[in-house]
Each structure stands twice: as structure tokens, then as C-alpha cells.
From Swiss-Prot:
UniProt-listed Enzyme Commission number(s): 1.13.11.4
Keywords: Aromatic hydrocarbons catabolism, Dioxygenase, Oxidoreductase, Plasmid
Protein name: Gentisate 1,2-dioxygenase
Record bears the keyword Nucleotide-binding: no
Pathway(s) of this molecule: Aromatic compound metabolism; naphthalene degradation
Catalytic reactions of this protein: 2,5-dihydroxybenzoate + O2 = 3-maleylpyruvate + H(+)
Domain of life: Bacteria
Disulphide connectivity of cysteines: none
Family, similarity comment: Belongs to the gentisate 1,2-dioxygenase family.
Molecular functions per Gene Ontology: gentisate 1,2-dioxygenase activity
Swiss-Prot/TrEMBL GO biological process terms: naphthalene catabolic process
Amino acid sequence: MLDEEERITMSHELGRLEDLPQDYRDELKQLNLVPLWPSLRAVLPPNVPTRQTQPTYWSYQTLKPLLLKAGELTPIEKAERRVLVLANPGHGLEKMQASAAIYLGMQLLLPGEWAPSHRHTPNAVRMIVEGEGAYTTVDGEKCPMSRGDLILTPTGLWHEHGHDGNEPVVWLDVLDLPLVYYMEASYHIDGERQQVDPGRGDCAWTRAGVVPTPVFQRSDKRYPLLRYPWADTRAALLSLAADQPEQECVQVTYVNPETGDDAENILGFYALMLKPGQTLRLPVRSPAVVFHQIEGRSEARIAESTFALREADTCCAPGYTEVTLKNLSADQPSFIFMADESPLHRKLGVFENRG
């Protein structure tokens, strides 16, 4: 006689594919049919989703020589975009994704090079890692590139990269490519070199709460601000820390200055300042998160993994995972850029914050 616990356990043991007769399985396969119950627990597991994203770390000092070597081996004409992809082994390196919805790549542009104009369906941002003299022209607006700047190249907008300086420039590409590719909606269109228009969004939208209104007209641009200078973001973090010293988490979000919405509609982007010696435990949330060290040194504890982040290092954490960040300096702040899947999760109604 089975007791209650054994009956409950057995009731949750679903039938296996190999339990079915081979001729029945063959007939299903011939008709493009699949029985659900052998795979039901894999696609609908209890309490926490099945995650292929693994805690993963990329050292910039390790990958930089390989990126520069790519510059020697492959001219820009043969690469179009010279990138080393930061691939999460949990998804398989051939998938070229950091998480379910995030693609990361370190891109190199050498002096005098020009990456031709194109547009594509995935959204992208560029977090500038090092170097001066390069620029991205987006929808006719020329955006200079300096370390820590965030530059948007949203879906459907023409963009190209040029370099008038004398040293290599490197930036971190962050795209929602895995999601758009999975939806079978990913493609690009080549274009002609853009004509640069006068004016820049990062000059017109410079103060919170104040927006341009020529003859009482608000901007109708979907993305009025394309470049978020690091100097402004850093100053905002320092000001916030000084104004609210009791606040544990000093963090800002990159937003559309006209609407207050996230800067792009699939991925969210943030800048975080850790005070000297500070340890910060982040809430356990549903979206995966990427961390990129802009300034300083930090330690990231992601589940059972611990990574020491130096400037330009990057790591990622799967969703539903405990993350603790620590500033390894006792006298200097640490600045971290973050990207996550929050906007997507909120739009789909699956966002969770478990505290």
C-alpha cells in the first residue's frame, strides 16, 4: 500500500518518450507530431525556469591582444564590423549570445578606417571602452566616442563608424540580436555614407526636466538622445551620492528624455556607483544582467562564482540568481555599466523581483 507522499511523487513522474512503442513514435515523427508529456517538466519546471545562461567572465586584458591581432589579420573591408563575440558557453559558443536576449561583442576600429553605413532590425548600443578620435553617425547625427559614453543605434536607424584619430578605439556592442533572430526577424540593409546634420542631441537635451520646444513644439523623434556622455552620467552619480548619502544603491537609468521610457525598448541600460569599500546585494530578479566595469575595481559574486572585475572587464549573470557586488577599493568609487532584459520581461508580463 503506497503512502500519501509516495502517491504524490509518482503523480509527478511523467511518462518518458522511450516508454512509448517505437512504431507509435515513428508514426508521430512521420506526421511532424511530438508528445508533450516527456518534455513538459523541461519547458515548465517548478518554481524556477530552466536557464542556459551561465555566470561567465571576460577579461579585457586577455581578449584585447586577440582583438588587436584581428585588426592585423582581417582588414575592415573583409570584416565590415571587426568584432570578437563574448559568447556564453551555456548557450553554446556557436549561438553567439551572452544570455537569452543579449548579444555582446568587442569591436575594434583602427585609425583611418570606416565601417560602412547600414541599418538592421536588432537594437544596439555602444559602450565605449578605450581610445579617442572615432565617431558613430546615427540617423545623420555625428556622435563622438569617448570612454564610458553610451551611443544608441536603435532598430531601423542608419549608422556608420569612422575614425579620425591615431589610436585604436574599442567599444562593447550590446544588442537584442538573440531575441530578434529567434523571432526570425533579423536582417540588415546596406546604405550610402550619411550626410551629417547640424546639431547634437547630447547638447540639446542636457538638463533633466528641460527639453527643447522651438515655437512650442516638442520633438517628434523616437530617439531624441543618441549619445549619453560618460562625463554627464558620472557627474550625476557623484551628485546623487553626495545629495543622498544615506542611499545604499547609487544608480541611474539611461532613458528617453522626452518620454521617460527606457532608452531602447527591449533591453535596459544603467550606471551604478559603488562607494569605497561598499558591498551591495542586488535583488533576485527574473532578467539576466550584464556587468561592465567602466572605472575602478569590483568583485561580482554570482551564485557560486566569483569574478574580480578590473576596468573594461565584463561578466554576466542569469536571471533568478543572487548577485553581490563589492568595491575592492577602500578610497575610490567603482563605476559599473549594466544591461539587462527588464523592458522585455515587463512587456511580456513575466518580470519578477523576488527580493
